[in-house]
Amino acid sequence: MTAAWVSRVSMSPPLIMVSIAPSRYTLELIRRNGEFAVNIVGETLEKTAYGIFGSRTGRGIDKIAESRVKARRGEKTVVPLLEEATVALECKLVKTVEAGDHVLVIGEVVNALKFSEEQPIVFTP
């Protein structure tokens, strides 16, 4: 899933927030598994981020296989990390908060990996 809203919540402990629509399969998986990753991508994966990860559900397809992006299991979690991302943040779920038409997913960053020097893309509405 491509997230439009990601923000730091706390430095100690290191917490981040991702805003996810309640209908998203990603939210179901996060609640079930108690962990997630935020893969921050650069221009190399921009079309893939929006075209496959951002617009299609993973309920019926393997998005990683379809995108042909190299991925590996996290070091501190079992979630996939995209090796072509600039940075990957492994997170343990702390809590979810219903907020209007989205759910705020708050996670503690338990590991951060830098894969490249590429500048990350930033979504600007």
Question: Locations of the language-model features?
Answer:
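Basic, polyanion-binding surface patches
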Residues: M1-P125
